[in-house]
Amino acid sequence: MMNILLINGPNLNLLGTREPEIYGNKTLSDIEKDLTKVAKEKSINLECFQSNYEGEIVDKIQESVKSIQGILINAGAFTHTSISIRDALVGSKIPFVELHISNIFSREDFRKESFLTDKAIGIISGFGISSYSLALEGIIGYLSSKD
């Protein structure tokens, strides 16, 4: 069975209440339940992890090296600031898809730079909550083609 890790960064635990005009009304728990169901239907084990702390995200990536085949990451604000998360992802050699609910390239200038994009196998941005399912489809397709 393929094992995929979903990582959500800072403030994504506030989905459903935080700026619903940008991020929608679904909670992170709703998203995780829906995505886990889709993954299970495809015989994939999806592990979900959220942290507001950069070091915890780095630790999770490092701990996953032997058990996870692919990562989906919505690093939130860490997308634009975290070299340590970038280094952990690169060092892990686990293929990853960067995802964002909003289109980060159509927002404030500081959100247009990502420390992850050039190392990701792909990026999904701007499709609302559907960005999660699109990213899952993308990583499954990528990993399946590598078998």
UniProtKB/Swiss-Prot annotation:
Entry EC no(s): 4.2.1.10
Keyword Lyase found: yes
Pathway assigned in UniProt: Metabolic intermediate biosynthesis; chorismate biosynthesis; chorismate from D-erythrose 4-phosphate and phosphoenolpyruvate: step 3/7
Active-site residues (renumbered): Y23, H100
Keywords: Amino-acid biosynthesis, Aromatic amino acid biosynthesis, Lyase
Record-stated family: Belongs to the type-II 3-dehydroquinase family.
Reaction(s) catalysed by this chain's protein: 3-dehydroquinate = 3-dehydroshikimate + H2O
Residues involved in substrate binding: N74, H80, D87, I101, S102, R111
GO biological process: amino acid biosynthetic process; aromatic amino acid family biosynthetic process; chorismate biosynthetic process; quinate catabolic process
Oligomer status and interactors: Homododecamer.
Protein name: 3-dehydroquinate dehydratase
Site (Transition state stabilizer): R18
The protein's role, per its UniProt record: Catalyzes a trans-dehydration via an enolate intermediate.
CDD domains hit by this protein: DHQase_II (cd00466)
UniProt key word Endoplasmic reticulum: no
GO molecular function list: 3-dehydroquinate dehydratase activity
Pfam families: DHquinase_II
